[in-house]
Amino acid sequence: MKYTTQMDAARKGIITKEMEIVSKKENMDIEILREKMAKGQIVIPANKNHKSLDPEGIGSGLKTKINVNLGISRDCPNVDAELEKVKIAIDMKAEAIMDLSSFGKTEEFRQKLVNMSTAMIGTVPIYDAVGFYDKELKDITEKEFLDVVRKHGEDGVDFVTIHAGLNRDTVKTFKKNTRVTNIVSRGGSLLYAWMELNNKENPFYEYYDELLEICAAYDMTISLGDALRPGSIADGTDASQIAELMVLGELTKRAWEKNVQVIIEGPGHMKLNEIEANVILEKKLCHGAPFYVLGPLVTDIAPGYDHITSAIGGAIAASHGVDFLCYVTPAEHLRLPTLEDMKEGIIASKIAAHAGDLAKGVQGADEWDLKMSKARQKLDWEEMFSLSIDDEKARRYRKESSPEHEDSCTMCGKMCSMRNMNRIMEGKDINILRSED
Amino acid sequence: MKYTTQMDAARKGIITKEMEIVSKKENMDIEILREKMAKGQIVIPANKNHKSLDPEGIGSGLKTKINVNLGISRDCPNVDAELEKVKIAIDMKAEAIMDLSSFGKTEEFRQKLVNMSTAMIGTVPIYDAVGFYDKELKDITEKEFLDVVRKHGEDGVDFVTIHAGLNRDTVKTFKKNTRVTNIVSRGGSLLYAWMELNNKENPFYEYYDELLEICAAYDMTISLGDALRPGSIADGTDASQIAELMVLGELTKRAWEKNVQVIIEGPGHMKLNEIEANVILEKKLCHGAPFYVLGPLVTDIAPGYDHITSAIGGAIAASHGVDFLCYVTPAEHLRLPTLEDMKEGIIASKIAAHAGDLAKGVQGADEWDLKMSKARQKLDWEEMFSLSIDDEKARRYRKESSPEHEDSCTMCGKMCSMRNMNRIMEGKDINILRSED
């Protein structure tokens, strides 16, 4: 092998087969793609051990991608049920799946997942550590934390969330700046607990170079987690969040020195007018690295509808340059998502990504909308259904409510503007009262 | 009576009882409210014949309001079924209901609606004209169109959509600038048809002064309709739309000369990065009149999910100064909404309005979110439910998936960040493995 990672290849001027695939999918000139990868503006998460992967690029100028969270846990230990979700998520064209398994047969699940998934796979190794070692959190050693990451690399995981920006300095900032919801990142709170209980530095920060060696060995992309992301509107864009983002910027450069591909994770909860500033800050402080956000949720008051609060935030974020959206389901803040929750979350997230792509001018994004609108103008229902983000639902909705006239729908009936405009523009009369035509 | 309309009162320095109610609800100084009403920046739609009205203000500095569309039609003629929806819409705190009835016992429905509704009532009189006169559209006379408006005024309608900006000039612009989806406004397309079939000027434009006399007599607010609103991403912010908006600005001034309160209606479909410019244009060209938008829908490709595409657009619009959102349901582009569709539409729209209010800094808007986040930090589930935009759904979601530990939820179980942070910050240990606590 003439290169270690995709970034190393890009910097050496080598075109990998993954680059070729991404270049074709996105209709991006391969030299431009390679240059952006060399600069870290685009990543192709592709672990050398993930043989079934259909690679996707994430970053500048590319379509906004979405991630689906799954995994087994104490409250939901059924491997087969989760693998069923995986199949559907892939059918629904999620580009990434994060395995957040925290309990039970996590190794079996992860290996099956990597084996079957054409979508890229991400994990948060710290979730797996307690179960893997069967040791209480505070007793896990620094070396053991790193070994879990290595294990995930061996298993073919394409990107790992590592909360390396939570260090003694950012913890000081956190303690000085009171928050309403403290640390809401699951991995972040576990690391904070470990640091406090052991009075030690964050092992992922302290042994960051070793971590990078592991990532480079498998070409595992590092997704720098935002342990201090805001968990409420009140905490949005606060000192702790920005202090951590600055550390993530430093860690980005160190990763790039070792040709490790980097993604930056972002909020969280914030008022929608703060989103643009957050994207600008990330792109600046993290030197153009791809930005991956969880939401942002633009209000706290809608549990049961956080697929909507995050679709609002995600669309705005994507329009300003966010590259990768983590889906949020209606179950957020309430329970583990069911299969139906997952589907709703995927669709809301894909809508947000596409709305963002239209706004940021991703090449070809508006062709889809143009086709749909032309079908609407022609009242070509079959064409409309086939272009719908959810063909089945659109079809079902119309079928459940049959219109008087086949060309219109029950919303307007014979007052359908499309129907009447088409007639008038063809020089025909229109009628509302008569039923013969 | 010492004044004709709320605007007339405001200009004469008179404080009406409606102003007092709105001032208290919004916690806005009554003199500021009165001044803004005198300038046309705030309206209180309140027909003198709508006795059951609980008045609401719409405009600058006030909470963003939402409207629910209802009504009987050929495909859904059941008066009682629609009145049942009305009750639920009011229970769900929709501030406005537009009766879009187009067929059947529209008079009976409208009168019952006004009689029972504490929410303000709007109509689009042209929808009612064909049925009211039992005459084909093109045979309805100018005087008859105006008489329908008068009838709605007598019946106590608080605001009427009048597409007076579609005139011979704007039709010329429309014909010169090809569109993908032509005219998608139902009322707009009917008026266009009438104008083309009769080769005449738009009666609402030609007899605008007479129309204003009618509106002034009942203090019926005029909601200047956007006949030329874009119906597709491709047509967003085009020449026809802006040409009409300029006419609406002229008509606004003419209405204000007669103390008639004015709302401006807006898009429609557009890329999300165009929304801010649209709000700036409306506020400028229409001299600060309140802006009422249908969406905007930020993509065309999601029939079945247009409550989400419009929540994205509506939240952004509200954040930039839009004052009033027309709800959009999952049934948009497919069928008349069912009761369930209506509920989903109301909630999505309320989320958008509130997210906008947080961003534009409406007084007190963030208190709701702060309370919710404090409840989350305390893991006080009862408090969270009672603060939820949909208490029932939030409760049901949690109940359907019981967690191992009562304080957490099945999403994270014992890895709950709130739970663990609270323990660590109290100096306690945490455990993930042991089940005893």
Curated annotation (Swiss-Prot), chains A, B:
By its UniProt entry, which InterPro entries does this protein fall under? ThiC, ThiC/Bza_core_dom, ThiC/BzaA/B
Q: Which HAMAP family match?
A: ThiC
**EC nos:** 4.1.99.17
Report the family membership: Belongs to the ThiC family.
Keyword annotations:
4Fe-4S, Iron, Iron-sulfur, Lyase, Metal-binding, S-adenosyl-L-methionine, Thiamine biosynthesis, Zinc
Task: Reply yes or no: does the keyword 4Fe-4S apply.
Answer: yes
Q: What is this protein called?
A: Phosphomethylpyrimidine synthase
